[in-house]
Regions:
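Long, ordered, amphipathic alpha-helical scaffolds
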Residues: 78-161
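Residue-level signature for tetratricopeptide repeat
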Residues: 3, 10, 43-45, 79-83
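Solenoid-like repeat scaffolds
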Residues: 25-32, 59-68, 94-103, 137-139
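Active-site-proximal binding-pocket segments
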Residues: 47-58, 66-74
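Short, charge-rich amphipathic alpha-helical segments embedded
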Residues: 26-47, 106
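Structural motif corresponding to the intra-repeat A-B loop/turn of tetratricopeptide repeats
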Residues: 14, 49, 83-84
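Short coil/linker segments at helix-helix boundaries
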Residues: 1-15, 33, 39, 95-100, ...
């Protein structure tokens, strides 16, 4: 499973996106409980190449729709903004995402600089979790017109309360 994951990641980095996605999906079929966290990587990949229908299917799949990990909630926020813009639904997604990890906003908006290395361990809700997510997901976020500016506006309002 780890070898197949490594292959999927290498294929992605070499620009062979369809082959990479196929490997990610294969891993999830072989291991639907996904103790490797492959769904998080797959979701970011789908967002990065704007396969939003496929991303929506993954996020809402019966296996993972109730996932409350920060990576999942922040990627749900991205999709909600793509689909609905600054809507009540998107604002609810933002609230849930901030509750899961409020550090994400600072790194996604550039208020804090992301080091170019991954942490050795991840603390749920911690800055290290935020840094790792942003290292993987920033390209997807930057491809959505207005999303980072919207996040900056929404979270700066929260800071002033």
């Amino acid at each position: 499973m780890r070898a197949k994951l490594g292959l999927a990641q290498c294929l992605w980095l070499s620009g062979r996106y369809d082959e990479s996605l196929s490997n990610y999906y294969d891993i999830l079929k072989l291991n639907p409980n996904d103790n490797q966290g492959v769904r998080y990587l797959l979701a970011i990949c789908l967002a990065e190449i704007k396969k939003y229908d496929d991303l929506e299917k993954l996020l809402n799949s019966k296996e993972y729709k109730d996932d409350i990990m920060a990576e999942w909630l922040w990627t749900k926020l991205l999709l909600s903004y793509v689909r609905s813009g600054d809507s009540s639904e998107t604002n609810i997604c933002l609230k849930k995402a901030l509750q899961a990890n409020h550090y994400m906003a600072d790194y996604l908006t550039g208020r804090k600089k992301v080091p170019q290395y991954y942490s050795d361990c991840i603390t749920i809700g911690g800055e290290d979790e935020a840094r790792c997510y942003v290292l993987d997901a920033i390209d997807a976020w930057e491809k959505v017109d207005g999303l980072i500016e919207w996040l900056k506006d929404k979270t700066s309002l929260n800071e002033n309360k």
